[in-house]
């Protein structure tokens, strides 16, 4: 009954997801909450009073590029309900917008004007409290990303650095996204457990001296929890960050009580909490990819005992390859089903990209903490610029290799068979049985037949 009610809450549209917009053009006012760039236009997310979120398309020029979260606009356009642009694509863009709270779209182009700061503050104060919290986080994130402007001169490197450390992805161009996707490291541009895990690792290393006493240990874990959720809030409370923040919070609470928490239990508990708060996340591709990748990593971790006796650098490299391979293999069928492509050289890319992510996040933490000291900030900025440039150059080189991307888009039945085969293979590995092996052969044969029939 609980599962059925949750499913109905996901599938059936919410009452506020559809608004009867007036026909024809009208004049509107709203507060900018987010911006995103495309080659010839700029998409601006606006919060209209009393409580409606609209995505407006503006002409890309110096005026629209200067817009920031918290600005107020007056524009004239016809607002319509979200609709799909490409009818042949499997991706339901309109449903994706509605699940993210966008209830209308408008083609404004150049028929808009920026209102004064006083009007913007007045409109912002009348927004719902949740919208005000999100707006405050967006302003904070925008202010931090602007500090990179003086330190990192390259627009491309600065866009990647802002996305990787702050979750500010509005400067990412299609070329950057394509490069990272073809290289198999698109997950670096979306804040997730990897990024939060790096921050928690740095924190626990810095606070290790406090762990010698009970009060010091309590202070260290409470400070870690504060930083975890502050980072999640500033970066926009995205789904992967929420999942990772919940998991790391549970781990900290377990460690505080001198108990060894079960990672799988923490993963499923975080999924349960997220779905209770927002059941519509169940249909989000990001939710599915995020949890599949973490689940695969947790399931293959017991294989570490095969190489645990090696020297530490080799163990670290083997861990990196094992986790990267597990995450990519687990998400490959779903990625192919949704996007129609599969990267081939993801292991080669991750060997360099993940260590760079560690250094970039650590350097960004030092960069912001020591920003009052100009000399140190300048030194950190030069290091960040060099690392981000080296990372981009490496990934551009890897993505240019021949046969780097496989174009394959399985249907729903083939995708389900892939995951069924993976589950049975894992089951057979844990408890070998000829019947499970026979089931694997049947599933593999059915998958092959389904693929042939779909040609």
What is the predicted function of each stretch?
Residues 37, 152-156, 239, 262, ...:
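Proline-centered turn/helix-capping motifs that create local helix->coil transitions or kinks
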Residues 2-187:
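Membrane-interface helix/helix-cap signal primarily in integral membrane proteins
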Residues 132-134, 138-139, 166-171, 235-240, ...:
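Hydrophobic alpha-helical transmembrane segments
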Residues 19-28, 40-48, 120, 126, ...:
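Juxtamembrane/interfacial segments around transmembrane helices
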Residues 106, 173-346, 408-454:
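Hydrophobic alpha-helical transmembrane segments in multi-pass membrane proteins
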Residues 30, 77, 164, 192, ...:
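Divalent metal-coordination and catalytic microenvironments
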Residues 63-78, 96-97, 102, 117-119, ...:
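Non-globular, low-confidence helical/coil segments that flank catalytic cores
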Residues 295-403:
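Alpha-helical transmembrane segments of multi-pass integral membrane proteins
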